[in-house]
Curated annotation (Swiss-Prot):
PANTHER family: FLUCONAZOLE RESISTANCE PROTEIN 1 (PTHR23502:SF23), MAJOR FACILITATOR SUPERFAMILY (PTHR23502). It comes from the Eukaryota. Its main location: membrane. The central cytoplasmic loop (residues 295 to 350) is critical for the function, but unlike other homologous proteins, has no apparent role in imparting substrate specificity or in the recruitment of the transporter protein. It is found in: Cell membrane. It comes from Candida albicans (strain SC5314 / ATCC MYA-2876) (Yeast). CDD domains: MFS_Tpo1_MDR_like (cd17323). Residues 1-115, 173-183, 228-242, 295-350, 412-428, 477-503, 550-564 are cytoplasmic. This is Multidrug resistance protein 1. The overexpression of MDR1 is a frequent cause of resistance to the widely used antimycotic agent fluconazole and other toxic compounds in the pathogenic yeast Candida albicans. Belongs to the major facilitator superfamily. CAR1 family.
Amino acid sequence: MHYRFLRDSFVGRVTYHLSKHKYFAHPEEAKDYIVPEKYLADYKPTLADDTSINFEKEEIDNQGEPNSSQSSSSNNTIVDNNNNNDNDVDGDKIVVTWDGDDDPENPQNWPTLQKAFFIFQISFLTTSVYMGSAVYTPGIEELMHDFGIGRVVATLPLTLFVIGYGVGPLVFSPMSENAIFGRTSIYIITLFLFVILQIPTALVNNIAGLCILRFLGGFFASPCLATGGASVADVVKFWNLPVGLAAWSLGAVCGPSFGPFFGSILTVKASWRWTFWFMCIISGFSFVMLCFTLPETFGKTLLYRKAKRLRAITGNDRITSEGEVENSKMTSHELIIDTLWRPLEITVMEPVVLLINIYIAMVYSILYLFFEVFPIYFVGVKHFTLVELGTTYMSIVIGIVIAAFIYIPVIRQKFTKPILRQEQVFPEVFIPIAIVGGILLTSGLFIFGWSANRTTHWVGPLFGAATTASGAFLIFQTLFNFMGASFKPHYIASVFASNDLFRSVIASVFPLFGAPLFDNLATPEYPVAWGSSVLGFITLVMIAIPVLFYLNGPKLRARSKYAN
């Protein structure tokens, strides 16, 4: 682990301030540091500095550089611009930038192993809290007995957890984009609260209290899911971003399936309450590890801190940072608009976002519906034990991993290499893979439903579930990348916040009616066939959505006031 990981971690920052900058000092605070002339109090801007950064006219990414997706926007091409802007004198202010294109303090210049370790940490964090969504579901029967409630009510804690991490991004995503807060402090503080909440959740003695605690747990679990992709983008070059996001999202997509796997073992060996003690332990371990090893990577926050250090060293109050300039111009009204209204406006008014939200919400809901459907067949028909039922969820993980190993080399061939060859690459490059994912998703649902009968081997439904999961992974990856490449940087946070809220609300209600849907459509020979077929026909129709984007993507983006 590199020294800067500890220096810029939560513990490192606290130690730095408590020791009055004696420990974990930064390069600018070294005795032999030579302050660049432009930061000195008596520095006079020359004609060469006249082309200053215009914060209102030019979108700047979180590394303090012109945003790649904003450049060359006239031809709707995805391009990259990693050139540092050396023109950093803005009127009477001196805007702090990186010390050259190869500044080692810039996370995008970290060595590959350090980037990989950072992405692993974000993925582990996501997995350690995200498995909490369905971790207790193997113990629902025991929960129903203890609290004297029905199945639908016993499913409410799952529903409210999912709603919680749909609402959370409306609060935490804007905070993580503010230079004062950054990403790491939000990760650590919310993770600490999540860990603490697992204690009363494990001890609560009524369903109302359990539901409230589960909602709060989901709310404080949301930053890693909502901001994890942005953290990956902090350290990964633009042309490698789809690969980095795929690596991180393995934890996000596989996490809910790990929950029932461990939950089934704990329920059999102890009780449903121990599923929450397990969450306390695993997320607590994650908290301790990340306190020491998770560095800040948000460029605006790092430059904000650098500006503060340079002001202290030089006594020059003209020194500022991009983040400080943005905060000084942000009004309370603008903050409310960006945080609460714009995600809703974009969802309703943008056809591209609305259609993607509907499709992804459906796919997301199907994955959560498996937590209700698997017991109907594997326990009710094949008489699996609870632990054996837990292992069946690993078929979802296997399907996702296989899809990732196929997706990464394909996307490198179709996206990364053309960009490195300086060829034009359009957002629609992701869509053919999404169409393939849609076909796999639909095929998997039909395979799962019609192979799950009383006479065939149970491996058939597992193959169908794995195929469904593979398709879901491809749809998630490609449509998220398509949205990220299609909209202006200023609106990306609102676009994804709307998606988080929309898909979480829709997915949260599916487990409530999942079992009744399959029970009402069941036949003696095929207990889940017709229920799966209903979902299969719906997803078959929805394949038209990526096909529409592939045929008319540029036209749809041209009509949008938010798109590139």
